[in-house]
Amino acid sequence: MLRIAHRLDLQLRAAMDRAFPEQAAAARQASQPLDPQLAPASKPEFGDFQANGALALAKPLKQAPRQIATAIVAQLQADPAFTDLCLEPQIAGPGFINLTVRPERLAAEVSARLGDQRLGVPAVEQAAPVVVDFSSPNIAKEMHVGHLRSTIIGDSLARVLEFRGHPVLRLNHVGDWGTQFGMLITHLKQVAPDALDTADAVDLGDLVAFYREAKKRFDDDEAFQTTSREEVVKLQGGDPVSLKAWGLLCDQSRREFQKIYDRLDIRLNERGESFYNPFLPAVIDGLKDAELLVTDDGAQCVFLEGVQGKDGKPLPVIVQKSDGGFNYATTDLAAIRYRFGAAPDGDDARRVIYVTDAGQANHFAGVFQVAQRAGWIPEGARLEHVPFGLVQGEDGKKLKTRAGDTVRLRDLLDEAVERAETDLRSRLNEEERSESEEFIQHVAGTVGLAAVKYADLSQNRITNYQFSFDRMLALQGNTAPYLLYAVVRIAGIARKGGDLEVLTGQLQFSEPQEWALVRELLKFDAVIAEVEEELLPNRLCSYLFELSQVFNRFYDQVPVLKADAEALPSRLALCRLTADTLKSGLGLLGIPTLDRM
RNA sequence: GGGGCUGUAGCUCAGCCGGAUAGAGCGACGGUUUCCUAAACCGUAGGUCGUGGGUUCGAGUCCCGCCAGCCCCGCCA
């Protein structure tokens, strides 16, 4: 309906110009043209759209809002293009103008979407690269629940942007550099030197244990700390022994990460922190040239504007430590320059999106400010932190295992699939259905992972997220199983003889449930546009849930296969477009669908 | 101390550029199956939108104060 909304907006503006020529001209001169405030109708009984602009004009025009609305409507009715599109507008309440699109126009919109891969979503015209930076686990650690949201949300946002036609660079900014490596390598040199020059000498689980030990020593032992720092400097200086050890550790971790990504069907290009190593000195030079750099306590800093620390002094972003080493702020700045920079040493991006937890908001705000002041953000480019809240257990505290450890992502996914399998088996039992082992594994795997993804995505990402297997796997409510079931129902119609591919001429609808479904289906383009702009996947989830509800109502109350000969093709067309929209929408959430479950 | 986020029904949460009587789901209670998968559908009950001011024709939404919870605050990422 975006095209129709756009057309209506223009028609409304023209009508306002004709109704109030002097005020319209004056408003345009003040570069605040009269706004019809066109919005989707807040309730179905108000039609398809509402224009609230008359209310705002009451004061400047010194007229009653309903009188203003009447004048605008009179002008609209004089416009043949408008009367061709809409029924007679209704003025309601204090002065709302309610607009209802002609049924035949809605039916024509549905027709146009049948068989359209894009489902009415326009492709972007100017396609500049978009960077989505997400997931970002640390080398030598296992992926855990802390990586869940970034990975799932980032992937979904990338999919939506790709669907709109943007060239998307999915970057995995893995933690493969810095102090942590100094600690690990120093520790391994002492306790497991094999791991540093032989591939797979220890497995990843051991490596994680070594890492934990190293971290403990680092925190407790000053001498170890110093050696570790020296090790980092060696690594950053390109010492061959350190580099080889580092390479082996990275390979090993990378393979483990890939297993998770394969399982979740997530595509990512690894470009870790180390990638930006050669560009770090230029960051310092650049900041020096921009006269932003200040030496403080031996460290190179940029002091932030508008952000005060404990003592009321401006807060610094440290870009070079007193020992000469660089840190994450330096890397992030180098990454910003690279991503906005021109090829070959740059990505030429116009939008860069970071999907990381909300706890890093201060860090990014600081880094973005420095980049801005250094002039590294091109005119019109967008640099956005997409924050999300913590994953909490049902007790409202940070999610932990019963033993109090961090939950491994692998275990979390396993449990979701296991629970889905248990549910499925007991259901099959109850219904006295018999299915192959292959069917059970496939359905349980799909439903389990879909549930994990959907539960996360369906929540506004800003707030903390309460993780609950029971809720996400529930068969009713705003859950993946409920949505998947709607798709299964349509597949059932196709199996039972409904030819969804049949092409019909004129679509015709008679039942309110059909019209409700038509109107819901036509909202898809606006929802995608909104997610692209706001980067909130939960908006897409809400839409798909509502679409499923409207479809289930239709399915329950209106016969499809047993419909009259005249109604049948149109109803099959609705089923087809619903299935396509649900599959496409779920696909943008990274969730595959099933024909039977 | 400074900064950020959050506070909406018993629970988990939506709420779009400020717009009409604040919405879902779960849970509770009641109903629906000779018919395309009842994993569904229909209905009932449930609200001082943390709180006090302000702006506005109109505030859950914007501004200011306060309260509560979570997170961050110099050489980890």
Curated annotation (Swiss-Prot):
Organism: Synechococcus sp. (strain WH7803)
One GO MF term: ATP binding
One BP term from GO: arginyl-tRNA aminoacylation
The protein's enzyme class: ligase
PANTHER family xrefs: ARGININE--TRNA LIGASE, CYTOPLASMIC, ARGINYL-TRNA SYNTHETASE
Start and end residues of each stretch annotated as Disordered: 23-43
Entries under NCBIfam families matching the protein: argS
EC number in record: 6.1.1.19
Family, per entry: Belongs to the class-I aminoacyl-tRNA synthetase family.
Localization per record: Cytoplasm
Key words, A-Z: Aminoacyl-tRNA synthetase, ATP-binding, Cytoplasm, Ligase, Nucleotide-binding, Protein biosynthesis
Gene Ontology terms: cellular component: cytoplasm
Subunit structure: Monomer.
Chain span(s) of sequence motif 'HIGH' region: 137-147
Catalyzed chemical reaction(s): tRNA(Arg) + L-arginine + ATP = L-arginyl-tRNA(Arg) + AMP + diphosphate
Name of the coding gene: argS
Name assigned to this protein: Arginine--tRNA ligase
